[in-house]
Amino acid sequence: FPLPIETEEFREQRFGWLEKYHLTPSCYDAFLENRIFDNRTLCLGEQINMMKRDIRLASLLGFHNLRTLVSTPMEVIEGSLAYAQQMDVRIGLEVHAPFSLNSGWADGYMEMIHRTGTKYFGFIPDMGIFCRNIPDVVRDKARRMGASEACIRIVDDSYAERLAKGFTKIKYDLNLGKANMEYRMANGMKEMMDAIEQANGNDADRWYANASFTYSWSDPQDIIDNIDYIFHTHAKFYNMHDDYTETAVAIPEVIEAFKKAGYKGFLSSEYEGGEHLRDIGVNSIEQVRRHQEALRAAMEK
C-alpha cells in the first residue's frame, strides 16, 4: 500500500524541517516482524524483502544507519548486505542486555563480517549492558508493589555477586527464550529464587527477582575492542537525579571508553525508567535534559 514518505511532498516537508531545526537523522529503528501470521513464520526470502523495505525507507528518510533487533536471523542480515551497500545504509544489530560484545554470541556475527568483508553491518550497543546496579526506579516500584526489604536485599546481593564474579555471557541461539533461560540459570537464578522462597517471598518479590535479569554488566573495554564495528549507540538510562548522576548505568566509565576509542557516532538518549513510574508520573523531558547534560559533562571532562 502507498506510504506517505513515498511522496515528494512529504520528503520536501521533512527535509525542510530538518534544515530549519538543525537536525540530523541518526538511526532508523527497524523491527523484523517475521511472525505477523498466526500459522507460520515468514520464510527467509520474505524476511530479507522486509529488511530491504526498511533499508529503502531509511534511505528515503535520510538515515544512513538502521537498527535491527537481536532476534533478526543472521541469514537475513547477510542476505540484505548487498542492498544495504547499494542504498548506503548500515545495518546495526542492537547489543541489548543480557547480550554483550566480546562473547560467543557476538563471535558469530564477527565471523560473518570478516567472511563477507562488509562495511555495512556492525553493532549498536545499548548502554543497559553497563549497569553496575539494578535501577533504583525498579527497586522503588517493587516496594510499591509490596516487595519486602529482606527479599530486595537478596536480589540486590545476588546482582552484586554476579557483577563481582563476572556475568556468564549468553550464548548464540535462534531460540532466544532458551538462550535467555540458560543465561539466567548460569548466573544464579535458581539459588536466588530458592532464597526468596525461603524468605516467604510474594509476587512482588518474585517480580523484582526476575526483573534483575534484564540488566547486566559488561566491561567498557568491550567498546574499545570493537570500536571499528560500532557506529551508533542507544544511550539507555533509567533515572537521572538532581545532581545529574545515574545510579545504575556507569555513564562516566562508558563515555571515557568511547573517548579513548575515538568514537564519532551518536549517543541517542533512551529513557526507559519512565515505564516503572506510570503509577506516580514523571517529567520525561526533564529526565532527558539531565541525561544530555550528564553526557555532555562526561564528554568534556
Regions found by a protein language model. Name each.
Residues 1-19, 242:
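Glycine-rich, proline-tolerant flexible connector loops at the mouths of alpha/beta enzymes
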Residues 2-9, 31-49, 83, 138, ...:
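Surface-exposed, active-site-proximal loop segments in enzymatic domains
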Residues 4, 102-106, 132-264, 278-286:
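Gly/Pro-rich active-site loop or hairpin
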Residues 6-13, 44-52, 74-81, 105-110, ...:
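Charged helix-capping and loop-helix junction motifs
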Residues 18, 58, 91, 126, ...:
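Conserved, mostly hydrophobic/aromatic
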Residues 24, 34-191, 195:
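Active-site acidic/histidine proton-transfer and metal-coordination neighborhood
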Residues 266-274:
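Short acidic/histidine-rich active-site segments
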